Every structure is written in C-alpha cells, then in structure tokens.
C-alpha cells in the first residue's frame, strides 16, 4: 500500500510546480502553456498506476499526513480518502483537463493573458481534486469554495463584457445559497458528532437527522444547478469555451452530485431525503430538456443538456445508486467536453457566431469536428455502445426496477426522449442543412492543438463507458434481472426522441407561417423563471421601497416634523397666549355699526 499512496501523492504534487513557476520566473511566457499541458499529461500518466493498483487490490486507503489544529474536543488533520469514487474520478478529470488545456492553446492563442488563464484552469482542477479526495468536512469545504471562486474568475475572464461580469456574479450568488446549506450541515455535525472526519460522522449518525441532510441537498442543488437554483448554468456560457468545457464536464457542476455520493451512507437511511432528491432530479432533467429544445445558441443547448444530465445523476442518488451516479459522471465528462470543444471549433471558425440558424453545411468543410459532434451528441442521447449508453441505460433500468415514485421515473423517460430530440436538432441545423453563413469565411481545422484533444475525447466518447464498466466494477454489483420491455425502455426512449426530432424538423421546414405558438414561449423564455426572479421581483421590491420611502418622507418630514407641524404649533400657541383672534373685518364692522346708529339718532 505504500506504493499506492506514494504514486497518488506524486500525482497530486506534480500539479504544483506549474503554479509556483510563475512566482519564481514571471517572465517565462512562451514555453509556459506547453509546460502546463505537459505537467497535466504527466500527472494523468502517473495517476493510472495507483488506479490500476486499486482495481487489482480493491482496498481503500485513508492517508493522514499533518494535524492542522487541535482543541480540547476537536482535531483537524490533512486527510485523504482514496477509495472507489476518488480513484475512478481522478484519471478521468486529469485526462479531460489535459485535452482542454491543449485545446486552449489553439482557442486562446490570441489572448495576451493566456498564461494566467491556464494557471486558473489548473487551480480549478486542483480544487476539484481536493474536494474529491477529502476525508474531512473542512478539507472538503476548502475544495468546495475553491471551485466556486475559480468559476467566478474564469466565467468573468472577459471582464470588459457586461454579460460576462453579470454571469459570474449570478453564479457566485446562487452558489452562496447552496453554501448556506453546507455550513448548516457543518455546524450540525460539529455539535452532534464532535468531529468532521467522514468515518466518525457516518458511524455516529446511523439514523441521521433531516436537518443536515436538507442542508447537504441544498448545497448540491446550488452547485449542480438543480431547478430553482439553475439560472447561473446557462448564463455561465459567457465565459470562454474551454472554461465551459471544464466547468461542465469534470469540475464544478458535478461537485454537488459528488457531495451526495460521499454522504450516501447517511442518505440511504433517510427515505425522505431520497424521495426529495429523486423528485428534484426528475423535475430538473425534464425542465432542462424542454428548455434545450428551442434554444438557438449552440453553447446554451449544450449547457441545458448538462443541467438535464445533472438531474439524471440526482435521480440516481435518489434511487440509492451512488456507483451508477459516479459512472455517469465519468462517461458524461468525455462527451460533454467533446461537445463543447466541437462547439468552440465551430464558433471560432465562423467568427464567433453561436446561432445554429446561421450555421449549416459544415459536414464537408469541417469533417473531423462534424464527426466528433455527431458521436458526442449520440453518446449524450444514449445511443447503444457509445459511452453514454453504458451509464444511462443502467440508470433507467435500475430506476424501472425500484419501488419509488412512478411519475418521477416516467418524466425521466420523457426527458431521455427529449435528449435525443434536441441532440438531433443541433446536428441537423449545424451540419446537414444549407450553409447560412457568409461565403468569404475561411474555415480551417488542421491545427494539431485542435485535432489531438478532439480525437482523444472522441475515443473516450466511444470506448470510455465500455472500459470503465468492464474494468472498474463496484465492490458489490447487483444482479439485474428485468423483463425485455423494461430492458429496452431506455433505447426506445432515445430512438423515439430521434424520430420525433427528424419529423418535427421536416414539418418545421414546410410551415407557411413563421409565428411560433404560445406554448413555444415557455421553452424559449426558460419557463419565465429569469423574467420572474431576475426582473419582476427586483422591480416590485424596488418600487415598493421607493413608494415606502417617499410616503414615509412626506408623512414624517412634511406633516409630522417641519412645516405643517410648526404652523400648527404656532397657531395653538397664539390661541393660548392671546385673547385676540385677529378678526379685523369683524372688529371694523362692530365699530362701524354703532357709529351708523349714533349718526341716525343725531340726525
């Protein structure tokens, strides 16, 4: 086991020199991007050794190196948990990041601050590794917050754009809501377990209280963009495409799901939390799939597909299958990163055009990108024997066997069909239709820094699911026996979505009227959620505050304190002090009447 822990530590420490290199030699600019890429490639190669050893030995390890602080009742140590979840995820995250780093050398070549950009991406990866390998809640919280901070910095990378700054602030605010739940769970475990070590927390909470689990679910919902806390995810597309690829594939958005995977010894003993997680995930996966159907921005289509797949992972947690959730995280990382890379290649070659209605005919001009986009879209839809099939088919098959909410499982199947529909729509608009972009545009996809990572991830989208399911099984594999109609449910849902998308695309081209029906606006306006939460509620609150402030000002200052109050006090004071009323006309009339009477009597 010493060899196992040593190689794992070497994997983690090999990522530190590229960060310190900029501090030692700030003028090292030309060779730094390739140095970072080589460091991550080396870390990936080294990580295969401890992962292979874990597959052979099947024994998890907890490494405690250094005691941070000790109080009378609490000891905090630097502790790493090297188990099935962390050792499976680690090489996948490193491989994805290596490919994205190499893709960034092409995509961000003209950026003057590319060195800092790559360093931020590397720190983003390191914070995610800290989160994944943490064995205590404080260390996990450090990785959790680090992922959030780095996402803020990377989404707002193009800080001169107002939309990018707004999207970054939106992401950090929605994640702060989730952090409230995490901090609540931290405080509860400290008060009731007197420890933040995961083993002790699990041991002392066999019948867990609902409050900390609700806090953990809120944290996962914020970080993994579940319904209600989801608007930041499509807005995050304002960042550079490499950021979107890394954020959506193997870092921030899967951190919430990974948190629930880590705490599955507690959630499996709480039927209420499992039911709530299942329903939340099912609603999210359907809502995101509906929103993706009508989007025209290619990156937002992929973003909503991420939200839909995150909902599917939450469904998997809700049916108490954490190993399947991790399997879907790993397979999803390959084809989601590939989808973003293909989108970035298309956007870059079409002079930053992201509207799929202004694309088309790219099948011949960009053959490799078109092939990769098709493979990744089909893997997303769950086409048989691609990587997505091995996880999605198992999830739906296991869900059909469970005794939980039928309606949640039904809408999950509907969302699976819609996944095939919007994936097919994106392929048809970008690759097969007539070109809708200006002819003078020069398209070139022959750069090696573009081709190599796309080919690498394309192979992952083809074979990763097969390799992971056959070589890294869970420690206790359930024997699945289902009737044929349930076994084919996932495949039938996928094929139904593909056929519906083809039929709707044909009918849409034949329509005489171009006015969309009213139901269209629910999808294109994202369920009116941003309009209500980001526009209506702030407008009403500001209007109410304005009216209250003005009315209170008028009532207190004008009527109660200054002008009218002074005049009222002066009037009452004059009445009290003086017996004269100041009625000049009455006084003059009382003088005039006796005078007239006297004159009449004399005359």
Swiss-Prot record:
> A cellular component term (GO) from this record?
mitochondrial inner membrane
Top-rank taxon: Eukaryota
Q: Which residues form a coiled coil?
A: none
Supply the gene name: MT-ND5
What NCBIfam families does the entry give? NDH_I_L (TIGR01974)
| Pfam families the record matches | NADH5_C (PF06455), Proton_antipo_M (PF00361), Proton_antipo_N (PF00662)
The protein's location, in the record's own words, is: Mitochondrion inner membrane
| EC code | 7.1.1.2
Catalysed transformations (reactions) = a ubiquinone + NADH + 5 H(+)(in) = a ubiquinol + NAD(+) + 4 H(+)(out)
What this protein is called in its record is NADH-ubiquinone oxidoreductase chain 5
Q: What is the lineage of its organism?
A: Eukaryota, Metazoa, Chordata, Craniata, Vertebrata
Q: What does this protein do?
A: Core subunit of the mitochondrial membrane respiratory chain NADH dehydrogenase (Complex I) which catalyzes electron transfer from NADH through the respiratory chain, using ubiquinone as an electron acceptor. Essential for the catalytic activity and assembly of complex I.
Q: Does the keyword Hydrolase apply?
A: no
Molecular function terms, GO-annotated: NADH dehydrogenase (ubiquinone) activity
Subunit architecture? Core subunit of respiratory chain NADH dehydrogenase (Complex I) which is composed of 45 different subunits.
PANTHER family (alphabetical): NADH-UBIQUINONE OXIDOREDUCTASE CHAIN 5
What disulfide bonds does the UniProt entry report for this chain? none
Biological process (GO), any one: mitochondrial electron transport, NADH to ubiquinone
Annotated keywords? Electron transport, Membrane, Mitochondrion, Mitochondrion inner membrane, NAD, Respiratory chain, Translocase, Transmembrane, Transmembrane helix, Transport, Ubiquinone
Instruction: Give the UniProt family note.
Output: Belongs to the complex I subunit 5 family.
């Amino acid at each position: 086991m010493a060899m196992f822990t040593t190689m794992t530590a070497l994997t983690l420490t090999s990522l530190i020199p590229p960060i310190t290199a900029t501090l030692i030699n700030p003028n090292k600019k030309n060779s730094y991007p390739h140095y970072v890429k080589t460091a991550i490639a080396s870390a990936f190669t080294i990580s295969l050794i401890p992962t292979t050893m874990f597959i052979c030995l099947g024994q998890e390890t907890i490494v405690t190196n250094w005691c941070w602080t000790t109080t009378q009742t609490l000891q905090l140590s630097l502790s790493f948990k090297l188990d099935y979840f962390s050792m499976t995820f680690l090489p996948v995250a490193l491989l994805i990041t290596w490919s994205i780093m190499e893709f960034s050398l092409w995509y961000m070549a003209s950026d003057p601050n590319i060195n800092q950009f790559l360093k931020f991406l590397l720190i983003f990866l390191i914070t995610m590794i800290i989160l994944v390998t943490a064995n205590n809640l404080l260390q996990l919280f450090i990785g959790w917050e680090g992922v959030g901070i780095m996402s803020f910095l990377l989404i707002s990378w193009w800080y001169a754009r107002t939309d990018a700054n707004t999207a970054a602030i939106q992401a950090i605010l929605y994640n702060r809501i989730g952090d409230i739940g995490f901090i609540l769970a931290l405080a509860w475990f400290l008060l009731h377990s007197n420890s933040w070590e995961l083993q002790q927390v699990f041991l002392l909470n066999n019948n867990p209280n609902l409050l900390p689990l609700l806090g953990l679910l809120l944290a996962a919902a914020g970080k993994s963009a579940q319904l209600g806390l989801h608007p930041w995810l499509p807005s995050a597309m304002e960042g550079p495409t490499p950021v979107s690829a890394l954020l959506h594939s193997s870092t921030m958005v899967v951190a919430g799901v990974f948190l629930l995977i880590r705490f599955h010894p507690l959630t499996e003993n709480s039927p209420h939390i499992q039911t709530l997680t299942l329903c939340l995930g099912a609603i999210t996966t359907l809502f995101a799939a509906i929103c993706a159907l009508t989007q025209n921005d290619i990156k937002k289509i992929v973003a909503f597909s991420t939200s839909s797949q995150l909902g599917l992972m939450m469904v998997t947690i809700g049916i108490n299958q954490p190993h399947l959730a991790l399997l879907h995280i790993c397979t999803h990382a390959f084809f989601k990163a590939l989808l973003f890379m293909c989108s970035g290649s298309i956007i870059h070659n079409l002079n930053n055009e992201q509207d799929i209605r202004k694309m088309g005919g790219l099948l011949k001009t960009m053959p490799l990108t078109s092939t990769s986009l098709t493979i990744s879209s089909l893997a997303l839809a769950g086409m048989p024997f691609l990587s997505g099939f091995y996880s999605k088919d198992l999830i739906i098959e296991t869900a059909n066997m469970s005794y939980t909410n039928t309606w949640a499982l039904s809408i999950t199947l509907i969302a699976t069909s819609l996944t095939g529909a919007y994936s097919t729509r994106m392929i048809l608009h970008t690759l097969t239709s007539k070109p809708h972009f200006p002819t003078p545009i020069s398209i070139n996809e022959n750069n090696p820094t573009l081709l190599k990572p796309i080919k690498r991830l394309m192979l992952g989208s083809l074979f990763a699911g097969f390799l992971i399911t056959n070589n890294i099984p869970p420690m206790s594999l359930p024997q699945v026996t289902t009737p044929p109609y349930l076994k084919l449910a996932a495949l039938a849902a996928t094929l139904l979505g593909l056929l519906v998308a083809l039929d709707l695309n044909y009918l849409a081209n034949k329509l005489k009227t171009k006015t969309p029906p009213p139901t269209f606006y629910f999808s294109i306006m994202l369920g009116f959620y941003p309009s209500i939460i980001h526009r209506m509620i702030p407008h009403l609150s500001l209007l109410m505050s304005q009216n209250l402030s003005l009315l209170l000002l008028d009532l207190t200052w004008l009527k109660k304190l200054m002008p009218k109050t002074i005049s009222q006090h002066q009037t009452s004071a004059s009445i009290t002090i003086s017996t004269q009323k100041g009625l000049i006309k009455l006084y003059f009339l009382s003088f005039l009447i006796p005078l007239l009477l006297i004159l009449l009597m004399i005359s």
